[in-house]
Amino acid sequence: MAQLCDTIIHAHCIVTQNKERVILYNGSLAITSGNIVALGPKEEICSFWDAKETLDLCNMLVMPGLINAHTHVAMTFFRGLADDLPLMEWLKSYIFPIERHLTPETVRWSSLLGYAEMLRTGTTACLDMYFFEDVVFEAAIKAGIRCTGGESIFVFPSVSCDTAKTALEHTKKMAELYSDNTRINVVVNPHSVYTTTPQVLSQCIEVAEECSLPLHIHLSETTTETQICLQKYGLRPVSYCRDLGILTPRTTLAHVVDVNLEELTCLAEHGCVISHNPSSNMKLASGVSPIPEMIKRNLSVGLGTDGAASNNCLNMFMEMGRCALLHKVYWNNPTALFAQTVLDMATLGGAAAIHQPKLGVLAPGHPADLIALDMSMPNLQPMFNPISHLIYATTGMEVFLTMVEGEILYYNGTFTRFDYDSLSNEMKKVSHWVKEKLQLL
């Protein structure tokens, strides 16, 4: 007698991302209570399982949802505002001044827009750092996406918290509030070494240990950051963070561009996770993170878009393609990063970055966080190698379905939890608000 499950999905091709990197053709998977309970040939699944709902995606490729390993999702309101500038000028002349005027409502609508873009292009989880992070979480709950995040922590007052202590207390309250929410996870988010002090970073470590929370920080993003750290503390950023105790297996480091081989070995020895943000680093001319050297040292590396202000999109398919091509040309080696390696970064590496190892793979016992792509699109035919197409040919617009914990959040042009037209109208108001604030600079 067949067992009953909630949903069965049939697909032309299933990219599992399991340990063997199995690609299953004419396969199916069964889902119950948000988790995958079976995966295999269509005939086998149909003979053992009956479903309340069946999705026949016969022309489609099903794969794990992508994981954005570093972003500032609410910064969609900055998209296209300040381009073609170096990082420090970009931050000090545009980003920080306008952020002083932020309101929770601006963050709410801008976050929801960011999540809409993510879901539309196949992202099911992200690692976020911003202000009014409780509102960022509320928008994530509205959209249904997974969000790991926390309040940005600075030594100086921010628009949402007057002190680092206040930001840390807020972080602790959010951790308690969302402790039972499977899609919301809290991290301790010190912004960087140049916007904090040793005392602030030590306080961040204490809270992370006290509450058993991961820690997420921008590190070694530019040579300017390195110079600032050397001038202030007589150490390069990696050594500075090592001596403070920042570097642990529960720490995710965003960017990690201006590093030497000795520092990479140090990061590997401490088990840190890296978030690579190639588009942002290219746009701001921050440099190129030595990803091949990291992989040689068995460092876990995720892939992130950074914020829409410095990318200018939150599309992980575009990020994968840029990542692969950047390293080929930078290292003058077409094998510097293989397509499979880049896909691993956007799935399994992302799961490591948000410290949720069950994500990034389609297998029994794992959450049903998945996406389906229409492989009949002109740019995806013919298909000899699915992994090649995912990295070098897919744009993200082929995404037909996005699912988190077995729940469909995007399906064939429609978001299931919110009205996109209403969101678009709200963003027009946000755009006017930004223009008003620009006049104050």
From Swiss-Prot:
Binding positions (Zn(2+)): H70, H72, H218, D306
Keywords: Hydrolase, Metal-binding, Zinc
Residues the entry annotates as binding substrate: E99, H191, E221, D306
GO molecular function: 5'-methylthioadenosine deaminase activity; metal ion binding; S-adenosylhomocysteine deaminase activity
Root EC class: hydrolase
Protein origin, superkingdom: Bacteria
Reaction catalyzed: S-adenosyl-L-homocysteine + H2O + H(+) = S-inosyl-L-homocysteine + NH4(+); S-methyl-5'-thioadenosine + H2O + H(+) = S-methyl-5'-thioinosine + NH4(+)
EC number: 3.5.4.28, 3.5.4.31
Cofactor remark: Binds 1 zinc ion per subunit.
Pfam family, one: Amidohydro_1
Function, as annotated: Catalyzes the deamination of 5-methylthioadenosine and S-adenosyl-L-homocysteine into 5-methylthioinosine and S-inosyl-L-homocysteine, respectively. Is also able to deaminate adenosine.
PANTHER family in the record: AMIDOHYDROLASE-RELATED DOMAIN-CONTAINING PROTEIN, AMINOHYDROLASE SSNA-RELATED
Protein name per its UniProtKB record: 5-methylthioadenosine/S-adenosylhomocysteine deaminase
Source organism of the structure: Lawsonia intracellularis (strain PHE/MN1-00)
The gene coding this protein: mtaD
